[in-house]
Amino acid sequence: MINTKHIFALICTFFIILPLFAQNGTPTVAGARGLAMGDASVTFRDINSAFSNQAGLAFLDEMSFTAFGEQRFLLAEIGSYSAALAYPTKSGTFGLALNYFGYENFNEQKIGLAYARELFDGVAIGAQVDYLGTRIPEYGSAGKVTFELGVQANLLENFIVGAHIFSPVRTQLTDDEIDVIPTQLNVGIAYLPTEKVTLAIELEKDFDYTASFKGGIEYQLVDELSLRVGVGTNPTQNGFGIGIHLGKLDIDIAAAYHQLLGFTPGASVSYNLSGT
C-alpha cells in the first residue's frame, strides 16, 4: 500500500530540502516566540536573539538558556532543533548557539560562538562565528566557516531598530559553485507603546531571492501570559502562539501556517540561570 506521508516527504525533499542544501546555515527561527510573530525578530532583546541578531544579547542581565524545536509541515524528516546559552559579563555577553536540521539521510548542523556589547546607552553590536556542516551519507560531509554581524539601537523613547547580516562574504560550501552559503540581510523596527505591547516589522533580503516582509504583535495579557500573532510574505505564512512566564522559566508554544504546505508547530523552553 502506498504511504502518502512518505510520498509527501519525498516531494518536500526535492522541493524544500534540496534548495535548503544550497542555503546552509541561514539564521534559524528565533524560537517559538519568533515563529508566532512571523519571525520579525531582528529587534528581540532576549535569549532568542542568539538566533536572529546577536546584538540583542548585550541587553541580558542574567545567564540564560533556551531550547527550541519545530516540525516543519508536520514532517519529522524536516524538523529543526536549536539551543542557545548566553553569559553576560562586565566585558560583554558571550553566547553559544547550536542548530540541527533534517534527519539521518540529510542533515545540516550549525555551531555559533557569539559576542555582544552595549557601546552606549541603548546601542549595541554583536558578532558570531559559525561552523556550518552538511551531511548526506551517500555523498559524504562538507563544512565551512562564516560569520554574522548585528546592531541594535534605541530610537526615540519607544522604538528599537535592528539590522543583521549573515555571511556577508559569500562562501562556497562545496567545490560545486551551486552550493554557496547565502548572504542574508534583515532590517527591522519595533514599537513598544506600553510595557505590555510590542509591534515589530522587518524586511528580509536573501541576495539570491525576492525580499520578504515580516510583521508581528505581542501582547502581555497578564504577568504570566503573552499572546502573539504574525505574518510573512514570500512565502505567505501566518503565525500565532502564546508565552507562559513562570518566574525564571518561560514556555513558548507557537504554530505557523504555510499557504501550500500546512502547519509548522514549535515550542521553546527558556530559563534564566540566575536571578528571579
Show the residue positions of the predicted features.
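Domain-scale selection of a single, long terminal region
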Residues: 2-4, 19, 85-87
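Bacterial N-terminal signal peptides
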Residues: 9-19
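Subset of outer-membrane beta-barrel
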Residues: 23-276
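Bacterial N-terminal signal peptides that target proteins for export
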Residues: 1-11
